[in-house]
Every structure is written in C-alpha cells, then in structure tokens.
C-alpha cells in the first residue's frame, strides 16, 4: 500500500508536515506534487496513482479542501471525502471505503492534519451493510 500525496501552492507547507509524519510512521509515500500545479492537476495526479493499486490511498491538500474534493468526485470509481477532523477521516474509511481525502491548510493546523492523516490511513473498511452504499457510489460517474 502506498499513500499518494499532493498539494497545490496553498497546501505545500502542510503537505510536508503530513508527509514527514507518515514517513516516520513507516508508511510508503508517493508525492506527486509538481511546481505550478493547481488543485485540479494535483487531484488528478493523486487519483491516477491511487487507482494503480486497489490498496493505495490519497491525500490532497490545498487552501480549503473543497476544490480537490469536487475534482475527486468527478472521477469514476473514486470515493473521496473532504475532512477537517480526525473522526470523519477515520469513519470515511470504515463506512464509505473512501480512498482519498482532501483537507485545507487554512482550516486545519499541523497537529490536526497529522491526526486526520493517521485516522485515514489506519482506518479499515467495515463492509457489511455499508457495501450497498459503496456499490451505489461506484456505479456513479
């Protein structure tokens, strides 16, 4: 499993904080950030890498998280969540089988961003009754 991470200019500093934290937690990180990319390009790059392996997860950071979330939900088969708290990050894995989260550097601080990332990457899909919704989401697009 790889954690694919990317950011636009507004999310660069926080991306480095999250990236360093996850590397210290022994996760394999793939950083697809390229200079000058806007959130659309970054989100598409993260999604492309996430979709290479079923177990890959993605994190996109910009100013507010909304833009990358909108982009991610346009990608067939991608279930994503815009999060700004640890519980939502964890639960979106458990109940929605989300493979990507977005967050805003102007909304969350360093420690909260680390906890959001930790909750997301450590979350496990619960399946069961949640699979009906996930199947519905995966048919959209």
UniProtKB/Swiss-Prot annotation:
Record's keyword terms, sorted: Isomerase, Lactose metabolism
InterPro entries (alphabetical): LacA, RpiB_LacA_LacB, RpiB_LacA_LacB_sf
UniProt EC number: 5.3.1.26
Origin: domain of life: Bacteria
GO molecular function: galactose-6-phosphate isomerase activity; ribose-5-phosphate isomerase activity
Pathway: Carbohydrate metabolism; D-galactose 6-phosphate degradation; D-tagatose 6-phosphate from D-galactose 6-phosphate: step 1/1
Catalytic reaction annotation: aldehydo-D-galactose 6-phosphate = keto-D-tagatose 6-phosphate
Assembly with partners or alone: Heteromultimeric protein consisting of LacA and LacB.
PANTHER family: GALACTOSE-6-PHOSPHATE ISOMERASE SUBUNIT LACA (PTHR30345:SF5), RIBOSE-5-PHOSPHATE ISOMERASE B (PTHR30345)
Protein known as: Galactose-6-phosphate isomerase subunit LacA
Organism ancestry: Bacteria, Bacillati, Bacillota, Bacilli, Lactobacillales
Gene name linked to the record: lacA
């Amino acid at each position: 499993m790889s954690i694919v991470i990317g950011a636009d200019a507004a999310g660069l500093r926080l991306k480095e904080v999250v990236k360093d934290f996850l590397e210290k937690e022994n996760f394999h990180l793939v950083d697809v950030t390229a200079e000058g990319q806007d959130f659309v390009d970054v989100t598409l790059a993260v999604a492309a890498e996430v979709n290479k392996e079923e177990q890959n997860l993605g994190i996109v950071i910009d100013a507010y998280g909304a833009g990358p979330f909108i982009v991610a939900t346009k990608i067939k088969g991608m279930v994503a969540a815009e999060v700004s708290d640890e519980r939502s990050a964890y639960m979106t894995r458990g109940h929605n089988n989300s493979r990507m989260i977005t967050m805003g550097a102007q909304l969350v601080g360093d420690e909260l961003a680390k906890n959001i990332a930790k909750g997301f990457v450590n979350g496990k899909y619960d399946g069961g009754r949640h699979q009906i919704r996930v199947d519905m989401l995966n048919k959209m697009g």
